[in-house]
Every structure is written in C-alpha cells, then in structure tokens.
From Swiss-Prot:
Signal peptide: none annotated. The N-terminal domain interacts with the head of the 30S subunit; the C-terminal domain interacts with the body and contacts protein S4. The interaction surface between S4 and S5 is involved in control of translational fidelity. InterPro entries: Ribosomal_Su5_D2-typ_SF, Ribosomal_uS5, Ribosomal_uS5_bac-type, Ribosomal_uS5_C, Ribosomal_uS5_N, Ribosomal_uS5_N_CS, Ribsml_uS5_D2-typ_fold_subgr. The lineage of its organism: Bacteria, Pseudomonadati, Pseudomonadota, Betaproteobacteria, Neisseriales. This is Small ribosomal subunit protein uS5. With S4 and S12 plays an important role in translational accuracy. Located at the back of the 30S subunit body where it stabilizes the conformation of the head with respect to the body. It comes from Neisseria meningitidis serogroup B (strain ATCC BAA-335 / MC58). The keyword rRNA-binding applies. Part of the 30S ribosomal subunit. Contacts proteins S4 and S8. The keyword Cell inner membrane does not apply. GO terms for molecular function: rRNA binding; structural constituent of ribosome. It comes from the Bacteria. Coiled coil: none annotated.
Length: 172
C-alpha cells in the first residue's frame, strides 16, 4: 500500500489516494504487470466520489482513478462537520458502522474511512469496520452508508410531521 497523498488542483477538490496495487496477468509468454489505483475525491463540503484506475504505470492509473472519482461524485447532507444520525453501510463481506460525534471529538476511524471523511469535510465522527478490511470494500461500504443519510427535514416531509416533532423538541 502506498502512502496517502493529498492534492488540490485548480478545481478546489481534495484528492486522496487510498491504495495502489500491482496486479499480474499470466499469459503464454510470461507475466504482464500493471497497477491498480483506488482514489477518493471530495470538495470538503459533503460531496464525495470514488474511482478505480488501471494502467502499466502508476501515475496514469492514479489519474484515471481521479477522473472516474470526479465523474461519480454524490452529495451527502452534513451537520456541523458530522453526520445527522447513525448509519450502517455494507459491501461484500464488509460492514461499516458510523455515528455522529460531538464537536472536538475528531475522526475516530481507520485507514480508508478516514481518507473518505477528510475529503468530504467531516471533522467529528466515530466509525467501525466489521468483516473484510479490504480497502476497496471499505470505501464502497462507507459510500453506501453515507448515501443512506437523510436530514431531519427529509424525514419530517416523508412522515408528514414537522422538524420539531422529529427532533423531539419540547413545545412547553
């Protein structure tokens, strides 16, 4: 696994490289080596995308992954640098549990999840991985969980209630 790089290009997006693997294809004449890169791209304000790229050279694979991540960005509702509610994301044999944390708690998450949260602009969150710790699965499970997040206003509209009813604010 390569070191995690943080880059900012002219478009203001935060790019992070999660993993680079050397892959081998065995053919009749021998082995063909290539590189596979996994990256995440975020805007620091709730938008995040994941990309994979393959090439015979590392920089080309990383660039392909960054381009794919830019094209696959999703918007996630945030609340003061954390998430609105607890959520579970799944992908393959990986299960990711995320819950909001108080201001000043920091990011309590391991490896690839930390990179996703940094690129998104989440500063206070607690997260745990159960099952497979493959970086590809962790990133996909994290994005699955984040895509399930809803704001209190969304939930109130869906249930036909007011936001105060959802949040349990006392009327007295």
């Amino acid at each position: 696994m390569a070191k995690h790089e943080i880059e900012e290009r002219g478009d203001g997006l935060i790019e992070k490289m999660v993993a680079v693997n050397r892959v081998t294809k065995v053919v009749k004449g021998g082995r063909i080596m290539a590189f596979s890169a996994l990256t995440v791209v975020g805007d620091g304000d709730g938008r995040i995308g994941m990309g994979k790229g393959k090439s015979k050279e590392v920089p080309v694979a990383v660039q392909k992954a960054m381009d794919q991540a830019r094209r696959s960005m999703i918007k996630v509702p945030l609340k003061n640098g954390t998430i609105h509610h607890e959520v579970i994301g799944r992908h393959g044999a990986t299960k990711v549990f995320m819950q909001p944390a108080k201001e000043g708690s920091g990011v309590k998450a391991g490896g690839p999840m930390r990179l996703v949260f940094d690129a998104m602009g989440i500063h206070n969150i607690s997260a745990k991985v159960h099952g497979s710790t493959n970086p590809y699965n962790i990133v996909r499970a994290t994005l699955d969980g984040l895509s399930k997040l809803h704001t209190p206003a969304d939930i109130a509209a869906k249930r036909g209630l007011t936001v105060e009813d959802i949040l349990g604010v006392n009327h007295g």
